[in-house]
């Protein structure tokens, strides 16, 4: 609800997914913890440390604490785990990932940003695809037409493994 120069969000209706912060172009709506600035500062530190040690840009994988963590754990037990240059970042909900975090991760030094999302969360995923398209359009001129950002929507660890093997 717009109230003068502020935006009021009814906490009784809030699902806690972070969609409001992901799609808000002004930053007026944001989740309380972790805030966008906290996440971006964290990503900057991780990326700069990785680059200093490995002498190459890392890739980033956002995932949620329930769905994503379980698939990644399974991948580690059954397959070879995640690629060595792919840094997993667990967040409460992948609905929180918007153009701010995607482009911010690129500015922080990540060469690609992937989002592992749950196929059963249609509303979150629809918004995520819109945000990925926006972010790819924003960086299109510097990417030579290559997409920096991609969602992987699956419950299948084998499909995730196959997608990760395609990374350059």
Show the residue positions of the predicted features:
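A contiguous, basic/glycine-rich beta-loop/short-helix subdomain that forms a polymer-engagement track
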Residues: 31-54
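Non-ligating segments of multi-cofactor redox enzymes
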Residues: 56-168
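Iron-sulfur cluster-binding cysteine motifs and their immediate structural context
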Residues: 1-38
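Generic structural signal for beta-strand residues in well-ordered domains
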Residues: 17, 52-54, 81
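General N-terminal targeting signals
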Residues: 25-26, 46-48, 78
């Amino acid at each position: 609800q717009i109230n003068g120069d502020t935006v009021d969000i009814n906490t009784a209706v809030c699902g806690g997914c972070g969609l409001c912060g992901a799609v808000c172009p002004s930053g007026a709506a944001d989740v309380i913890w972790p805030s966008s600035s906290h996440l971006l500062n964290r990503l900057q530190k991780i990326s700069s440390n990785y680059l200093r040690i490995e002498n190459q840009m890392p890739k980033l994988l956002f995932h949620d604490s329930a769905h994503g963590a379980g698939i990644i754990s399974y991948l580690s037990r059954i397959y070879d785990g995640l690629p060595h240059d792919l840094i997993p970042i667990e967040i409460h909900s992948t609905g929180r990932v918007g153009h701010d975090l995607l482009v911010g991760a690129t500015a922080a030094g990540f060469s690609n940003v992937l989002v592992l999302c749950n196929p059963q969360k249609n509303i979150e995923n629809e918004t995520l695809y819109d945000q990925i398209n926006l972010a790819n359009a924003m960086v299109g001129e510097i990417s030579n037409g290559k997409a920096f950002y991609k969602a992987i929507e699956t419950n299948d660890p084998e499909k995730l493994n196959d997608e990760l093997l395609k990374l350059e």
